[in-house]
Swiss-Prot record:
The active site is at K170, E177. Keywords: Gluconate utilization, NAD, Oxidoreductase. NCBIfam families: gnd_rel, PRK09599.1. InterPro entries: 6-PGluconate_DH-like_C_sf, 6DGDH_YqeC, 6PGD_dom2, 6PGDH_C, 6PGDH_NADP-bd, 6PGdom_BS, NAD(P)-bd_dom_sf, Pgluconate_DH. The gene is yqeC. NAD(+) binds at G7, L8, G9, K10, M11, G12, N94. SMART domains: 6PGD (SM01350). One of its GO terms (biological process) is pentose-phosphate shunt. Coiled coil: none annotated. The keyword Oxidoreductase applies. It is an enzyme of class 1 (oxidoreductase). This is Putative 6-phosphogluconate dehydrogenase YqeC. Belongs to the 6-phosphogluconate dehydrogenase family. Pfam families: 6PGD, NAD_binding_2.
Length: 297
């Protein structure tokens, strides 16, 4: 397939390289010339000019949009007038599911297919095999299922159903992630405050071999402690990107109790003023899987 890729940030540049590895043709677009040049050097076409970008694709076009949720509407406003009926937009960032439903309806009126694709696995997943949760019309899904099959890990993609369902699943996934990361951080803070002198890298390693709590997150915990044995180089500030808040808000709307997720969100807010070891662990984990910045001491 020939894919038009909009957004060549940490996730977009890596998914673009994986598309090429899987023998798909890629045309990249970003306002950052250096990012465009990097993808072109890997074998893609690319430009910083949106009209030129669209001209390098032929109907029916497939656009993969991977930009921060706050600029999706601006991207759609600029690109949709350049598209033709039957073209497709796959929005693979972290948008609120209600916004995805609204955008689906807008694009449907213009005759453009619109899929909302929740993407998990961080930068490594984007580069080597991700997890996808996709919502939208089944007719559109059938066209691009091979693309998701090629770029997902084995059994790592799901057609979730109607518009919005893909990003709804990703939202809840991220809420669960908040709770899991908080529990890992709290556990290591208890270790830090105990009378024992533990090697946290070794602790994370042994817990990740055969224990009930083994996981990719525990593996990333080991990796973080390998780089900084006591996380002395970073502050315990845990930033949040919105999905945990959306999960809690949705749970309140549905009158569904989510105390673990809600408290993990509250602790992230608290970390903006109080430096804790839990915060250091969570901040380090976010940096490991998503390249999210930590605040240095």
């Amino acid at each position: 397939m020939k894919i038009g890729l909009i957004g060549l940030g940490k996730m977009g540049i890596n998914i673009g390289k994986q598309f090429i590895d899987r023998n798909h043709q890629v045309v990249g677009y970003d306002v950052n010339q250096a990012a465009v040049d990097e993808l072109k050097a890997y074998g893609a076409e690319g430009t910083t000019n949106l009209k030129e970008f669209i001209s390098l694709l032929h109907p029916p076009r497939i656009l993969w949009v991977m930009v921060p949720h706050g600029i999706v509407d601006a991207v759609l406003r600029d690109v949709s007038p350049l598209l033709s009926k039957g073209d497709m937009i796959i929005e693979a960032g972290n948008s609120h599911y209600k916004e995805s439903i609204r955008r689906y309806n807008q694009m449907k009126e213009a005759g453009i297919h619109y899929l909302d694709a929740g993407t998990s696995g961080g930068m490594e997943g984007a580069r080597h095999g991700a997890c996808f949760m996709v919502g939208g019309d089944h007719e559109a899904w059938e066209i691009v299922e091979p693309l998701f099959r090629d770029t997902a890990v084995e059994n790592g993609y799901l057609y979730a159903g109607e518009a919005g369902s893909g990003h709804f699943l990703k939202m809840i996934h991220n809420g669960i992630e908040y709770g899991m990361m908080a529990a890992i951080g709290e556990g290591f803070e208890v270790l830090e405050n105990s009378q024992f002198d533990f090697d946290y890298e070794k602790v994370a390693r042994v817990w990740n071999h055969g224990s009930v709590i083994r996981s990719w997150l525990m593996g990333l915990t080991e990796r973080a402690f390998a780089k900084d044995a006591k996380l002395d180089q970073i502050k315990g500030i845990m930033h949040s990107s919105g999905e945990g808040k959306w999960t809690v808000e949705t749970a309140l709307d549905l009158q569904t109790a989510t105390p673990v997720i809600a408290m993990s969100l509250m602790m992230r807010y608290r970390s903006l003023t109080d430096d804790t070891f839990t915060g250091k662990v969570v901040a380090a984990l976010r940096n490991e899987f998503g390249g999210h910045a930590t605040e240095k001491k």
